[in-house]
Amino acid sequence: MSEFYKLAPVDKKGQPFPFDQLKGKVVLIVNVASKCGFTPQYKELEALYKRYKDEGFTIIGFPCNQFGHQEPGSDEEIAQFCQLNYGVTFPIMKKIDVNGGNEDPVYKFLKSQKSGMLGLRGIKWNFEKFLVDKKGKVYERYSSLTKPSSLSETIEELLKEVE
């Protein structure tokens, strides 16, 4: 079993969100922020989620305040912002650190599987993305500049793969 499925972050309500419930799904994990130039990506992320959720795809957002202090709100405020401004219905987790001594185990795992540009492991900014296949393998890592809508073809390919 992939180490991915042993992870269990905490959701915005403080409840465990065990990743073993994601077995057989294609998962896009994104570190998100409410006051970032990339925040409008929420709209494309939600469109991707709605398009593929019934085919075995999900998105998980991890709010993070490590880049320019662009996610200052409480978990409840963040969830409200996402819902009111972008109609977000995909799961949003509790605010975490994605780098440094307090980095969340989810990001420690993801970064150990796929390094970023120039082989660097650290998350560079908000809205960096990790695409995980149906077997829990980190398939690809995308920079903040990558538009969520550009991932459709890859998501479709991964959804077609037999487990």
Curated annotation (Swiss-Prot):
Which keywords does UniProt give here? Antioxidant, Cytoplasm, Disulfide bond, Mitochondrion, Oxidoreductase, Peroxidase, Peroxisome, Redox-active center
EC number(s) stated in the UniProt entry for this protein:
1.11.1.24
Identify the Pfam families for this entry: GSHPx
Q: What happens when the gene is disrupted?
A: Sensitive to hydrogen peroxide and tert-butyl hydroperoxide (t-BHP).
The miscellaneous comment for this protein is: Present with 8000 molecules/cell in log phase SD medium. The active site is a conserved redox-active cysteine residue, the peroxidatic cysteine (C(P)), which makes the nucleophilic attack on the peroxide substrate. The peroxide oxidizes the C(P)-SH to cysteine sulfenic acid (C(P)-SOH), which then reacts with another cysteine residue, the resolving cysteine (C(R)), to form a disulfide bridge. The disulfide is subsequently reduced by an appropriate electron donor to complete the catalytic cycle. In this atypical 2-Cys peroxiredoxin, C(R) is present in the same subunit to form an intramolecular disulfide.
As for what it does, the entry says:
Involved in oxidative stress response and redox homeostasis. Functions as a sensor and transducer of hydroperoxide stress. In response to hydroperoxide stress it oxidizes (activates) the transcription activator YAP1, which is involved in transcription activation of genes of the oxidative stress response pathway. May also play a direct role in hydroperoxide scavenging, being the most active of three closely related S.cerevisiae peroxiredoxins (GPX1, GPX2, and HYR1/GPX3) with respect to peroxide and lipid hydroperoxide reduction.
Q: How does it assemble?
A: Interacts with YAP1 and probably YBP1.
Per the record, the similarity remark reads: Belongs to the glutathione peroxidase family.
Record protein name field: Glutathione peroxidase-like peroxiredoxin HYR1
Q: Which organism is it from?
A: Saccharomyces cerevisiae (strain ATCC 204508 / S288c)
